[in-house]
From Swiss-Prot:
Gene3D superfamilies: Interferon regulatory factor 2-binding protein
GO cellular component term, pick one: cytoplasm
Protein name: Interferon regulatory factor 2-binding protein 2
Segments forming RING-type zinc fingers: 489-536
Gene name of the encoded protein: Irf2bp2
Post-translational modification comment from the UniProt entry: Phosphorylation at Ser-343 is required for nuclear targeting.
Keywords: Acetylation, Activator, Cytoplasm, Isopeptide bond, Metal-binding, Nucleus, Phosphoprotein, Repressor, Transcription, Transcription regulation, Ubl conjugation, Zinc, Zinc-finger
Function: Acts as a transcriptional corepressor in a IRF2-dependent manner, this repression is not mediated by histone deacetylase activities. Represses the NFAT1-dependent transactivation of NFAT-responsive promoters. Acts as a coactivator of VEGFA expression in cardiac and skeletal muscles. Plays a role in immature B-cell differentiation.
Natural source organism: Mus musculus
Compartments in which it is found: Cytoplasm; Nucleus
């Protein structure tokens, strides 16, 4: 019952000739040579719709948008005569088969969606029952292709959907019911029509039947990578047809004319395989073009030997493999690069480049493909820290990831270290990490203060105030600061929370808990200038002016002393 209602509702809809969408009768306009919807008329303009309809009709005729079985069915007018077939159509027209009388009639008639007759019969789901769910055999699928080689992806409909919704809709989710030979050649050559004419001409000259040329043309044009594996296997089974029809290849596909392709074929033949059975031959067009370009630009030998012998070298050289296990995978790359020296460089320069005397294995030294200039990489390496510390190793991004440092923290670190002496203006902005919510991440400005302090102070004697923890280099993030030594208040020596304390922007070892900070502010007088809670007037970085708390910071610190009375539950 529901299916009958759906079919009845679908039968009332009419497809627009221009936009090809199913419309209700009240949305259609019948004042022109073809039924068009109001949306197309409004978009094109009533004065131009007829011209657009004629243009669309010519395009549909030229590109063969309606293969067999897709034209409207029903009573055909007696006056509608089939158009004269060209020589190309005669060559490529298959012999009639049993059970395909309807298909022959559909092919013979004009490729119009709607005959210019008053009796337009609705197309129901039963019209497609002969071709719906069953996958056609190879020969029938090839015969249903139009003459000029352009294939329609959804030549089949699904019975569970309203039939009017199946009219030439470019919906990709219906492609699974289509044989792989009917998938549109998206990445194929741009001159499909020309190649089809070349096939017809070649068939006419050589005397071969037209149907013999059409499967070869289908196999010659490479399909995109999204086509199922059955299509790739089908191509691999037709190497002889590819070699027999060289005229079908477009200029973009002519690998055989290049010297690199002949070398590839010779190399494959030396391994005991036919040239047409090479791996590169069954790849999509974009992959083949890329491989050929790499082969032409790499002068160290045939590219296939590089791919087969040293996959790690090519992967790291051309793609800059930024692996998660940093040093492990890159050491293997360095070993292969050291084994094979294609250029007469001294032995010491073959390995990974050294920066600041340390080996950087994450920079590849492959000499083919993508070369890395060593001079720009100096901008990624920060100067060594001025303070000696057990944590003074400079971590480059892969190694820092092993140490638990996030890539964003590494980027911030590189930007800070490359900046030089720009911290003086930052130091006047925020002087403490006075956040009430300890679970929130530290603000960037406070992180900069805690990170910039030790680098800029450098040689200052920070032990004068009895600093209880060593000065950490700027390369370590806040998490490693907290993990290396417990944070203690400089005054009361109590354990500090990771993010909930007051940090002196000048002296890194000056860290104060909130009770000590409140007491210091009250002692100094909150109305005037309030300096470092240590009692010293710590100068700003790069100047002799002592820093002082801003009023907002004083209010934040003192706000923790106020206890809010809870309301009684009423």
């Amino acid at each position: 019952m529901a299916a009958a209602v759906a079919v009845a509702a679908a039968s009332r809809r009419q497809s627009c000739y221009l936009c090809d969408l199913p419309r209700m009768p009240w949305a259609m306009i019948w004042d022109f040579t073809e039924p068009v919807c109001r949306g197309c008329v409004n978009y094109e303009g009533a004065d131009r719709v007829e011209f657009v309809i004629e243009t669309a009709r010519q395009l549909k005729r030229a590109h063969g948008c309606f293969p067999e079985g897709r034209s409207p069915t029903g009573a055909q007018p007696a006056a509608a005569k089939p158009p004269p077939l060209s020589a190309k159509d005669l060559l490529l027209q298959p012999p009639p088969q049993l059970g395909h009388a309807g298909a022959e009639a559909a092919r013979a008639q004009a490729m119009e969606r709607y005959p210019l007759a008053p009796d337009r019969a609705p197309r129901l789901a039963s019209d497609f029952s002969t071709r719906a769910g069953a996958g056609l055999p190879q020969s029938a699928a090839q015969q249903s292709a139009p003459a000029n080689g352009i294939l329609v992806p959804n030549g089949f409909s699904k019975l569970e959907e309203p039939p009017e919704l199946n009219r030439q809709s470019p919906n990709p989710r219906r492609a699974h019911a289509v044989p792989p030979t009917l998938v549109p050649l998206v990445n194929g050559s741009a001159a499909l029509g020309l190649s089809g004419r070349a096939a017809a001409t070649l068939a006419a000259v050589s005397g071969t039947p037209g149907l013999g040329a059409q499967p070869a043309e289908l196999g010659t044009h490479k399909r995109p990578a999204s086509v199922s594996s059955a299509a790739a296997e089908h191509e691999a089974r037709e190497p002889s047809k590819e070699k027999a029809q060289p005229a079908h290849r477009s200029p973009a596909d002519s690998l055989s004319s290049a010297a690199g392709a002949s070398e590839l074929s010779a190399e494959g033949a030396g391994k005991g395989r036919a040239p047409g059975e090479q791996d590169w031959a069954s790849r999509p067009k974009t992959v083949r073009d890329t491989l050929l370009a790499l082969h032409q630009h790499g002068h160290s030998g045939p590219f296939e030997s590089k791919f087969k012998k040293e996959p790690a070298l090519t992967a790291a050289g051309r793609l800059l493999g930024f692996e998660a296990n940093g040093a492990n995978g890159s050491k293997a790359v360095a070993r292969t690069a050291r084994k094979r020296k294609p250029s007469p460089e001294p032995e010491g320069e073959v390995g990974p480049p050294k920066i600041n005397g340390e080996t950087q294995p994450w920079l590849s030294t492959s000499t083919e493909g993508l070369k890395i200039p060593i001079t720009p990489t100096s901008s990624f390496v920060s100067p060594p820290p001025p303070t000696a510390s057990p944590h003074s190793n400079r971590t480059t991004p892969p190694e820092a990831a092993q140490n638990g440092q996030s890539p964003m923290a590494a980027l911030i670190l590189v930007a800070d270290n490359a900046g030089g002496s720009h911290a003086s203006k930052d130091a006047t902005q925020v002087h403490s990490t006075t956040r009430r919510n300890s679970s929130s991440p530290p603000s960037p400005s406070s992180m900069n203060q805690r990170r910039l302090g030790p680098r800029e102070v450098g040689g200052q004697a920070t032990g004068s105030t009895g600093g209880l923890e060593p000065v950490h280099p700027a390369s370590l993030p806040d998490s490693s600061l907290a993990a290396s030594a417990p944070l203690c208040c400089t005054l009361c020596h109590e354990r500090l929370e990771d993010t909930h304390f007051v940090q002196c922007p000048s002296v890194p070892s000056h860290k104060f808990c909130f009770p000590c900070s409140r007491q210091s502010i009250k002692q100094q007088g909150a109305s005037g200038e309030v300096y470092c809670p240590s009692g010293e007037k710590c100068p700003l970085v790069g100047s002799n002016v002592p820093w002082a708390f801003m009023q907002g910071e004083i209010a934040t610190i003192l706000a923790g002393d106020v206890k809010v009375k809870k309301e009684r539950d009423s």
